Amino acid sequence: MNMTFRWYGRGNDTVTLEYVKQIPGVKGIVWALHQKPVGDVWEKEEIRAETEYIQSYGFHAEVVESVNVHEAIKLGNEERGRYIENYKQTIRNLAGFGVKVICYNFMPVFDWTRTDMFRPLEDGSTALFFEKAKVESLDPQELIRTVEEASDMTLPGWEPEKLARIKELFAAYRTVDEEKLWDNLSFFLQEILPVAEAYGVQMAIHPDDPPWPIFGLPRIITGEASYKKLRAISDSPSNCITLCTGSMGANPANDMVEIAKTYAGIAPFSHIRNVKIYENGDFIETSHLTKDGSINIQGVMEELHKQDYEGYVRPDHGRHLWGEQCRPGYGLYDRALGIMYLNGLWDAYEAMAKKEVGI
């Protein structure tokens, strides 16, 4: 297991690498060029500056999250060709600086969606919350206002240039159903996977969050059947997944221990977090501790250990603790606690395995 920490860059994150370095066991930083407009080529000098800064603190910079996919590609319109070519060049450029995994998603318009960024928990902390009925009755513009008011930092997948075109995008997606979105993902992968494979980069698609349609927009990476369909597109070693327990696990029909058991081999990158699911379909993000939520984090980690998992792992969204003013879900304290819990589980399974063989 290669423990990492997501960081949004200098001037774009309340957490500094000086602080991350003080968390035991963190080997790498998961990063991106968040200032780049979606669809633009990530230039070599920009990549060099960011990776050298990360490496100056003793971290590797082998995982990028995310190189976002332009809406023209998801829509499959006449503009997608140039954006796909830009994406290919970005893959080449990143590989030249040691990047081995690129996380991406194929969610139309919105990235991860929540209705409350700072929902109070019983212990006094706050966390990201999803109210299903509210989303079903909410105008997308209201959701955008909720997100914009929650932080003065741009949230990934909620870029201002995209939100300014929200009505136009919704109109464009009226003709895109799940089947069409799968066709567009297939076209994209058939184009980029030969490049990724040639340059030794694994493309790790992130599940939809939450894993069901919202605002009438299709969602296609929602469960085990999605992974089977993804691999049917191409069995390239570069056609991979990001195992995200909190995203896919928000649907209780998705058994994350079984999914880890079956698909860890094609998951070079894992996001580990817990959510508490309510009977009405709402969910709230909790601590990483297994008993605090609905996902068997302990079982997922045990399964990864059984498979001698060598992929990159990071704690995912954390609660907001001890008065920390931070990007929603991405403070320092709870993610640091999450790392210690995950490392503790891993160490315990390691000790048990050694005891079984008499070491």
Swiss-Prot record:
Class of this enzyme: lyase
UniProt GO molecular function: ferrous iron binding; manganese ion binding; mannonate dehydratase activity
Organism this protein belongs to: Bacillus subtilis (strain 168)
Further facts: Member of the exu locus which is required for galacturonate utilization.
Family matches, as Pfam families: UxuA
GO terms (BP aspect): D-glucuronate catabolic process
Pathway: Carbohydrate metabolism; pentose and glucuronate interconversion
Record-listed E.C. numbers: 4.2.1.8
Purpose: Catalyzes the dehydration of D-mannonate.
Protein name: Mannonate dehydratase
Cofactor(s) the protein requires to work: Fe(2+); Mn(2+)
